[in-house]
Amino acid sequence: MAAKSHRALKITSIVIGVIVGIALIAVVALNIYMRVAFAPFFDRAESPFDIPGINTGFVPQDLDHVEADDSWLFSGYMADHSPSPIYRRAADGTITKFYVSLPDGSPYDGHGSAITTNEQYAYLACEEGYLVIPMDDLLFAEDGASVQAIEKVDVDFSPAFMNIEQGQLLLGNFYYPNDYETPENHHITTPDGTENPAVMYAFAADPAEPGRFLTVPDNVFSIPGMVQGTCITADGRIVLSVSYG
């Protein structure tokens, strides 16, 4: 009986060892593939600093560079669904974590999918719109504090990405079949016959209020699915970054 138990234990150990070995081989193979497939990226990439909060349940979604003081802002959400923080990394490496209160005083617990800034305000994506936060409040917030959003601006979808580029506010939605659907009128067939299932709005600056934007878009761009970022190059070309999973 003891011999049978010993044999069963030995077989189990061998099976577990084989499974672990296969898993390790798969991880190594994946790392090698990633290094080879994305070699041009890794050749040029730098690692200036670690993403703050990454090991505390914080799931980062966006970042923005504040030129005024050379700091970085990180938005995202918490895996445990607690209020969503914003991390600020100062030029000297000091990390500050603070929170955002909605205009009604309730805590912001949104996805934090996008944050972008100009000299006067920070704009933080929320459900069906974005929040407006005075930059002075944000830049001087103490660790653990809460900054007050002065307004929520409504949009007819929840922005998945948002960026201030060349004086205009760009924001768009994210499409992935079944999981992240978009309104039917956002689905447009392009001249080559493919379908773009999402849109990006471009809001012009508000001439009556420095740092703010008009609430009716100047332009609406038809874009592919799975877009999570955008910028405009110096020669006026629009760049879209795509990712999922």
Predicted feature residues:
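Surface loop/turn motifs at the tips and blade-to-blade linkers of beta-strand repeat domains
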Residues: 51-56, 99-107, 151-155, 218-224
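Beta-propeller blade signature
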Residues: 84-92, 185-207
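Short, conserved, GDST-rich strand-edge loop motifs in beta-rich repeat architectures
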Residues: 74-80, 172-195, 243-245
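Residue-level detector of Asp-centered blade-edge/turn motifs that repeat once per structural unit
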Residues: 65-69, 117-119, 164-166, 232-235
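Beta-strand-rich domains and repeat architectures in extracellular enzymes and scaffolds
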Residues: 49-84
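Repeated scaffold domains used in trafficking and secretory/extracellular systems
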Residues: 57-64, 107-114, 154-164, 224-229
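Loop/turn-rich, solvent-exposed surfaces of beta-rich toroidal or solenoidal domains
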Residues: 220-245
